[in-house]
């Protein structure tokens, strides 16, 4: 609301400024107050076609159009300084009012049209080979800018354009963890489309360009929480399908301790205080309760595979995902953790890296011929070529319901990452009956993601001051899991991905380093390959 009010006030002041200035260009003052007509007259005054004003209605490009109208407009009154151009875009009344009240300031004609005519004449003379006339035109250039100003304007435009593209259209991401290993590897750099699933407009508007949520080296957040905008998403070009890799904001990342190694939620530390004891830097933050509270679009970015869609019932039985009672489709390079025992200790590990088995994927098993390794089926087959008698067995996973969503050992204490669920994924418009058991499952969803006032009254849930026996969900949710199933912190750990947290769809890998290090080489075979069809 605050931001909209600022825009509204600024537009009203702009209209007043045009009302005061229009008589100087021979236009009735009242036209400056009429939306649409005022910009049509500005276009005429600078020599732009009138239809340019219509482009102000087109999202994304309208800011460039606005700047392309207002900057030449004030220049047509001889206001050539950089600060005057800046004011014409950011706070136009700050330059329009002085223009209107200075009798010495006159309209010099259609600035844009005259500038284009000059450039056309200059190009014509250059092609003719008349150096004398060309030098004369250059020396008498009425639109000359200093080298410093040219650089400043170029840098400002480049930064703004890059930030604009990153904010609305496409963003580059680097895979930092092995949770999608085999499909998307540590060191993969990829572009993510922000329009395929519907472009989400920024909610946090005051931010440092080209930074997501932290200022490198300073350890501070790169944005201000206020002013902000409400959630809005443009229509999607395609829906999110099961097994699509998706990029999203970490749903539980609204209150986080940020250590040098990673971010930890306040809830994670409360459930397992030993985490802070193992990390000295984190321990200091926890002791001071120095955690960051982040809005939706400034939570950390995660990339996982959408394995469950809205309305699905999902369950993991002996590592296999089941959707609505049927086995789900498995990714080609699905990985698990295995106990690997070779029949001999003289095993050649030289090719392991070429097979996609990174150093970080391998742990010692306590004996010279024993390893604990994250592997997919293809890698298992290659290990067997080294030793036909090798033993490769699934490594059992611990039972700790407190570490797994919904963190309730009373009802869900026997779950593991390999035997999990069933869980019903909320769907927009669907209504559920609230029970003591599923309240634990959907409490955060109803309270935080759906923005309700929620409390417990015995075994009942009180929503917005009223005891509720049922609840109807306001948006869709998804279930996301990493392909590296035993090395992925995903929906099994923190639950549902709300639709308003969806950032975009991975498109293609534009660069890839081996195991995330340039010193280990470049994965040339991964560059310019699809990031979604894996």
Question: Which role fits each region the language model picked out?
Answer:
Residues 1-6:
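Feature marks short, highly hydrophobic, charge-poor N-terminal signal-anchor/signal peptide-like helices
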Residues 115-534:
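Extended hydrophobic leader/signal-anchor segments used for secretion and membrane insertion
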Residues 8-109:
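Membrane-cytosol interface at the C-terminal ends of transmembrane alpha helices
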Residues 92-132:
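N-terminal intrinsically disordered, acidic low-complexity segments at the extreme N-terminus
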